[in-house]
Amino acid sequence: MLPGLAAAAAAHRCSWSSLCRLRPRCRAAACNPSDCQEWQNLVTFGSFSNMVPCSHPYIGTLSQVKLYSTDVQKEGQGSQTLRVEKVPSFETAEGIGAELKAPLKQEPLQVRVKAVLKKREYGSKYTQNNFITGVRAINEFCLKSSDLEQLRKIRRRSPHEDTESFTVYLRSDVEAKSLEVWGSPEALAREKKLRKEAEIEYRERLFRNQKILREYRDFLGNTKPRSRTASVFFKGPGKVVMVAICINGLNCFFKFLAWIYTGSASMFSEAIHSLSDTCNQGLLALGISKSVQTPDPSHPYGFSNMRYISSLISGVGIFMMGAGLSWYHGVMGLLHPQPIESLLWAYCILAGSLVSEGATLLVAVNELRRNARAKGMSFYKYVMESRDPSTNVILLEDTAAVLGVIIAATCMGLTSITGNPLYDSLGSLGVGTLLGMVSAFLIYTNTEALLGRSIQPEQVQRLTELLENDPSVRAIHDVKATDLGLGKVRFKAEVDFDGRVVTRSYLEKQDFDQMLQEIQEVKTPEELETFMLKHGENIIDTLGAEVDRLEKELKKRNPEVRHVDLEIL
C-alpha cells in the first residue's frame, strides 16, 4: 500500500508539508485484504495532510470528508463568498493517485454574510457637530455679521419659551471662517486680547457716570425690566410687615419712656422686645424687597430664598437682642433689686401696646389663613412648615408680644401689691424665655426651608399622573419637586419614553411615498447609512420636541411650576 501511496503523491506533483506517522494495527503476516483496507480516508486542508484510519472511534463511521475553503470576494461591500467543496472517499491508495490527477468536481455553495457597519472612533474630543449661536460666533471669534452670512445656517429648537426656533452655525465652519479672516490662531488670540482690553477700558470710563452707564445698557438691550419693589408693600406679606413696623416702632418709643420713668425691669424687657421686633421687621422688609428682584445670570432661579434668609437672621436677632438682654436685666434685678416708682403710666402704655399688638396679630392671622386656604392646607400646617416666612415671623413676634405684655403686666401688678421688686425681675426672665422659644422656632423652620423642602405629596402625585397619562411616556422615575419660595416650584423627573410612539409621531409628519422611494433606491451600505442617519437625527429632534411639549403642558396646567427638568431615561 505504501508504494502505491508514494506513486500517487508523485503523480499529483503536490508539495505535502507533512505525513503523519502510520500505526499499523495488524502485522504484515496476518494482514488480510479486507484488513488492509483500514486506511481509507485522506483529509487535506491547505498544505497539511493526514491519514486517518477508518477504525478510529470518531471518524470510522464517516463515508466521506468535506473540504471547506473560503474565498473572500468583494460583492458590493462587506459581503463574502463561502465555497464548499466535496471530496469523495477513496477505497485504495492507487485510487488516491487517480483521483488526485483528475480535476476535483466542485459544487460551490454561495452564502451571504451580513454587512456590519464599521464603528467610528471619535476620540476623547469631537466638536465637528457642535452648533454655536451668532452672538457667540461674533464675540468669541471676532467676526462680523457679514462674515456669518457666507456660512451655512441651521434652524434649531429654541431653549427659551418665548421663541420657537433660532439660527445656529456649525462651530467648525465658524472656526474655519475665523482662520480665513485672521490668518492664524495666534492672530485671533491677539485680537481677542485687544478687544477685551478695549472693552474693560470702555466700561471703566462709563462707570464714572452712572447715568451714562444706564443709558449704555438700555441702548444695548442688556438689562431686563426692573422689578417694582414698592408695590409688594401694599399687599400680602409686605403689607403685614409695614403695618408691624409702624406699630412696633411706636410701642418701642413709648415703652422706653415708661421704663425711664418707672425703672421697671419688666418694662425694660418689653421695650427691648419692641425694639428687636422693629429691627427684625425692617430686616424682613429688606428680604421681601430683594426676593422680588428679576433673576440674573449669577442667580438664574431668582432671589426668592431671601425671605427665608432674612427670617433666619431675624430669629437669631430675637435671640441675641431680645432674649439675651431680657435675661440679663432680669438676673441683675434679682441680684440688685431696685425700688420701683409709680406704675400708672406703665399700665397705660402696656394697655395701648396690647391693643396695637393684638391688631397686628389679627392682620397676620388673616393673611396666613387666606394663603393656607389658597394652598389647600390647614392653618396649623401652613404655619409649622413656614410656607410664608415673613408673615410667619410677624405672627410669632406679635403672639410673643401679646403674651409678653400679659406677663409684664401680671408681674408688675404683683410688685405693686406686694412691694417686692423680685416679681418684676421674674417677669423680665419670663419675657426673655418666651422670646428665646420664638427665636428657636424661627431658626428651625427657616433652616428646613433653605435646605430644600418638597411640595405637598398630593401635588407631586398630580404632576406625576399628568406625565404618566401622556401616550409617549412609559414610566416616571426619581421625581423631585421642591419649593423655591414665593409660590414657585421646581420639578425634576426621569422619563422613560415609548420609542414607538415617538417614532410614529415623526412618521405621521412624513410623506410615505417619498420614504418608500428612498428605501427602494438604497443599494449599498453607504446609502443605507445616509438614509438611517437622516431619519435618526429627525427622530431625536422629535424626542426633544416631545420633552418641550410636556414641560409646557406642566407649566400651563400648574402655574406655580416655574422650572421643569425632564431627563430622558
From Swiss-Prot:
Pfam families: Cation_efflux. Keywords: Antiport, Endoplasmic reticulum, Ion transport, Membrane, Mitochondrion, Nucleus, Transcription, Transcription regulation, Transit peptide, Transmembrane, Transmembrane helix, Transport, Zinc, Zinc transport. Gene3D superfamilies: Cation efflux protein transmembrane domain (1.20.1510.10), XPA C-terminal domain (3.90.530.10). InterPro entries: Cation_efflux (IPR002524), Cation_efflux_TMD_sf (IPR027469), DNA-bd_dom_put_sf (IPR009061), SLC30A9 (IPR040177), XPA_sf (IPR037129). The chain crosses the membrane at residues 240-260, 315-335, 343-363, 393-413, 425-445. The keyword Ion transport applies. It is found in: Mitochondrion membrane; Nucleus; Endoplasmic reticulum. Its main location: mitochondrion. Interacts with GRIP1, ESR1, AR and CTNNB1. This is Proton-coupled zinc antiporter SLC30A9, mitochondrial. It comes from Pongo abelii (Sumatran orangutan). The gene is SLC30A9.
